[in-house]
């Protein structure tokens, strides 16, 4: 089904323009999400949660898998993601117009259709009150949909919402910025993050992101 959807929807993208981008230089074993399960990636804005999601998508797409991102807040930036190594021709982007109910229905359709390596449900910009109103049966339905498959459902947000239905919970935290240049002309080289596996409990993993430009 995934191939059929992309064949129907794919359009030629525009040429990438020069821009700064955030690129994770590796994924540690601690951060590999389990297949056939729900994972949550949590953190505040600028905590590295989006960079981690992009790295997970890039790794999956590099293996030839088809992926999907369900964008509740219309915040996905294709240009920066292309610069981060994501092959857009194999990525389905679903825009939901800031309506979580549409995002949930889209996720349900995609998961039950099958054929996707990683499905990202981006709820980062949804308020905590909105997330609390999501009925719990949604998460049980999603868990049943991915069980015994090779798919990953990665839910991105600021607070945990899937409860016992999530097999993995990773919390991201921004640490230090790395600078070069002089005191008068500082240059930002990159940002360090820390990823803590809250479920299952494991040692925290340091991550390093670099800034650059691609034309």
For every predicted segment, state its role:
Residues 1-69, 83, 214-215:
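Detector for small/aliphatic-rich hydrophobic stretches
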Residues 20-23, 34-37, 49-53, 77, ...:
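Helical mechanochemical/support elements of P-loop NTPase systems and associated helical scaffolds
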Residues 39-41, 68-70, 92-94, 154, ...:
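Hydrophobic/aromatic beta-strand patches that form the interior of the parallel beta-sheet core
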Residues 55, 63-130:
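Conserved inter-motif catalytic segment of the P-loop NTP-binding fold
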Residues 89-91, 108, 136, 143, ...:
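ATP/nucleotide-binding catalytic cores
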Residues 120-151:
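Conserved P-loop NTPase nucleotide-binding/switch module
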Residues 143-215:
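Phosphate-binding/switch region of NTP-binding enzymes
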């Amino acid at each position: 089904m995934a191939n059929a959807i992309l064949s129907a929807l794919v359009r030629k993208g525009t040429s990438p323009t020069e821009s700064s981008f955030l690129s994770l230089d590796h994924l540690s074993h601690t951060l590999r999400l389990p297949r056939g399960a729900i994972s949550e990636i949590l953190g505040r804005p600028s905590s590295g949660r989006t960079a981690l999601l992009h790295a997970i998508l890039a790794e999956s797409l590099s293996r030839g898998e088809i992926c999907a991102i369900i964008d509740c807040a219309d915040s996905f930036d294709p240009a920066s993601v292309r610069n981060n190594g994501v092959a857009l021709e194999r990525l389905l982007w679903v825009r939901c117009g800031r309506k979580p109910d549409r995002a949930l229905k889209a996720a349900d359709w995609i998961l039950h259709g099958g054929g996707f390596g990683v499905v990202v449900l981006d709820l980062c910009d949804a308020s905590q009150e909105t997330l609390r109103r999501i009925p719990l049966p949604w998460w049980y339905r999603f868990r049943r949909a991915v069980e015994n498959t090779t798919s990953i459902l990665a839910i991105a947000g600021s607070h945990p919402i899937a409860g016992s239905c999530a097999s993995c919970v990773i919390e991201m935290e921004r640490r230090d910025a790395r600078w070069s240049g002089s005191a008068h002309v500082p240059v930002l080289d990159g940002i360090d993050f820390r990823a803590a596996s809250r479920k299952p409990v494991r040692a925290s993993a340091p991550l390093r992101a670099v800034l650059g430009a691609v034309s």
